C-alpha cells in the first residue's frame, strides 16, 4: 500500500524504509522551512522535561512534596518513553508518523492545560507521562523534517543535528531557569512547555511531511508482546529512578517490582523468539556485532552522566546555586551546539566510528580534569571539562545510531524496530542506571570519607580541642565541614570511576572498529 504521489517520484526521492517519508528535491526556501520545523520538534521533545528536571527543588517546594515524591516526575517521563518506540515504528509503517504525532501531542497538550488549571502532584505526574509518550514521535519528527532540509549527499548530517541539538536543552534550561522562575514560579515552566507544544503542533499541520510507503505490519501477537515489555521496562525505570532515594534494600516494593519486571520481560522475549515475524529480531540482537553496538551505546550513555550527576552534584556540594552556575551552563550549551554542528559537518560512513571514539576520548579527558577538584573549585574551573562533555555528547549520539543503521540496511527493514527499540532502551535505561550507579557510589564513598575524616580528628590537637570546648554549635559546624569535604572527595572518586569506564569503553570501541575494518577488507578481497 502506498500513499498517492510515491509512484511519481524519482528513485532517489522515494522512502528509504516503509514508514519513512519520501525526500523530494525541494527548492531551498522549502528546505529551510522544513529545517526550522525539525529544529522546533527536536527541542520540544527535550525542553519540557529538561525544565522540570533542573527545577525539581522549586517544584517540590511549590507542590509541598518530599524529595522521593519529586523524583517521580522525571522517572515517570522515562517510564512511558522507554517503550514507546516499540509501538511507534510499526505504527508509522502502517498508518504514518503524522497521525501518531498528532495523537501524542494532543494528549500532551491536554495534560499541560489540565495541570495549569488544576495543579497538584497527580496532574504533574500525568503531564510527565504524556510528555514521555509524545517525546518518541517528536524525536522522529525532528529527524524526518531535518532530512527534508538536506540534499541526499548530506542527509547523515540531519541525523546528527536531530539527535545532537536536543541535548542542549538541559544546559539551556539551567541557564534560563533563574530568570524564568522570577517571572511566575513553576507555572512559567509549564507555560513554556505549552507554547512549545502548540507551536510544534501548528508547524506540522501547516507543513506536512511528504508521503510515505505504508505496509501491513501489525500482528495480534504484537499486542501481547508490547504490554508485557512496556510494563516490564516501566518497572525497571521505577526501580532505577527511585532505588537510591528509598534505598535499594529498605523499600519492599523494589524487590517485588524487579521480580515482576523480570517475569514480564522474559515472557515477552520467549514469545518473540518463537514468532515467525517477531516485533524484535532477537537472533540478530544476539550476534557479536549487535552486542558490540549495544555496549558502545550503553557505556557511552553511562559516562556522559559525569556532567548531569557528577559535575552538577559537585557544584551543589560546594554551595553553588543556579545563579552562580549560569555562565558555566552557557558555555556547556554553546559547546553542545558546536558539537552538533561539527558532527554534522564531518559525519560520513567512513568517520562515524572515529567520531564515537573521539567523543569517548573527550569524556575521559574531562573526567580526568574534574577528578582534581577541591573545595576551592568553582564554575570557571570547570568550563573546559564541561565544554568537552557537552561537545562530546552532541557528537556521539547520532553516529552511534548510524552504526546500527548500517547493519539494518544489510539485514532488511524488518529489523529496524529492533534497532530503534534497543538503542532507545540503551539510552534511557542507561541514563537511569548511570544515575543510580554514580549517586549510590558517591553516597557510599562519602560515608567512607566522612568516617575517615572524623577518625583523624585528634581531640588533643589545639584547633579540635577549641571547637569541642566551644559547645554544640561549634561541634555541629565541624561536622558540617567534614561532611562537605567528604562529599567533595566522593565526587572526585566518581570522576575517577567515570574515567575508568571511559577508558574501557574506548578500548571496546577500538576493538569494534578494528573488527569492522577487517570485515570490510575481507569482503573486498572476496569480491571478484
Describe these PLM feature segments.
Residues 85-224:
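Helix-loop-helix hairpins in multi-pass membrane proteins, especially solute transporters
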Residues 59-61, 91-92, 176-184, 240, ...:
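Interfacial helix-cap and linker-helix signal at transmembrane-aqueous boundaries
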Residues 17, 405-407, 422-528:
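Hydrophobic transmembrane architecture of multi-pass small-molecule transporters
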Residues 75-90, 139-143, 330-342:
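Central cavity-lining transmembrane alpha-helices of secondary-active solute carriers
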Residues 166, 178-296:
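Hydrophobic transmembrane-helix bundles of small-molecule transporters
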Residues 1-47, 61:
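Cytosolic juxtamembrane N-terminal segment immediately preceding the first transmembrane helix
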Residues 32-47, 52-54, 67, 74, ...:
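12-transmembrane solute porter fold
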Residues 55-83, 123:
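Extracellular/periplasmic helix-loop-helix junction of adjacent transmembrane segments
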